[in-house]
């Protein structure tokens, strides 16, 4: 018995693999998996390590980079005419795009040829050439442009037909004489890409000229206040709006711009305070520079924003009296037509307008690489080293944006997207783009139906319970 046990023990010892054999075995079949974490992705790991080096949050421009996993305007489709309605002929029957804003109190409402406008972007965030090209291109298309943080450029006024003067919390560059030259005043409370915070212009873009306009030192980061210095809430804002009306002799409309947050309540408060026009900027909106986390983790999407805003105005029985402008990631004519159908009177564009100028165009590719970017995926607006001369104050880079050619590209794009809106309106039997309505739409996802109150395609059933659908049905 004992001998047999010893024999088995020796046999077991002999069968034990050597350390070398064990090592070879592990090399062939590694015990450690190469599957990346679903939580700590390579991008998250890189982000943590960069913050560990910098000891601060990350700043960039452009707007949210997250995959569009939420309900968007893409989740709606139009119902063209069949036997129930008669479509319009594309080249024989007209479809009006005339747009009027500010009819509530202003003596001279804003009258535009198209319902698409250039939103506020500052001289500082953008180059001189870019600001003038936006003004000239908007004029060529029969629409408006907006000043932005930092005041008005005289050349911007000279080259625009309709100019909206933006009044922001910073009050940089505010000039009463410039304000009185404007065709409308926009009192900005927030921005879709970074609601609840002020603007940011990094020192690399604060040239001597920008510093002089803003009365601040050159080469130093400029952080704008998050709230206005002379009012705190809606009751105080009533006085501010009256002050702006007095300054402009009650002639021009007063817009109030909101970053999409508590849209239903904010729109009601803005309308109650006396706004002629309410602007709501969704979370897909762009920015020249802000903390990355604000662009990715604040605000609500444009689709939800337009529905809540319309519901708020209808609740106050002011829909139609107070006009609604929607903004935030608007890309093409179908986005615009859907926004109009959901209740917007006009649409602001920012990033799309810059792309029409040549933003992200594959020119000067080596300069994209120098700032760690590539064409079609550059969001380095904050650096001041824009390869195509749009978001820079560098004189040499700025020369790359030829004003007349850029203005023509923008005007061409405006004409194209306006034609797209008309195509959809005619297909729905409408001779005016402002006659588009929720009945012309169907939702392709349950989420979109819940948010908009538009029936889910194939069911004709409305799902939901929020303010966005209560007032549409």
Residues covered by each model-derived region:
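Ligand-binding clefts of soluble mixed alpha/beta catalytic domains
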Residues: 351-431, 451-473
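Active-site-facing alpha/beta catalytic cores
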Residues: 120, 125-247, 251-271
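Conserved, well-structured core domains of diverse proteins
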Residues: 2-10, 14-116, 120, 125-136, ...
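A structural motif
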Residues: 142-143, 182, 275, 344, ...
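Glycine-rich phosphate/ribose-binding loops and adjacent secondary-structure elements
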Residues: 228-398
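A structural-propensity feature for long, helix-poor, extended segments
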Residues: 101-103, 161-176, 180-183, 187-194, ...
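Flexible, glycine/charged-enriched surface loops at secondary-structure junctions
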Residues: 148-150, 250-257, 319, 428-438
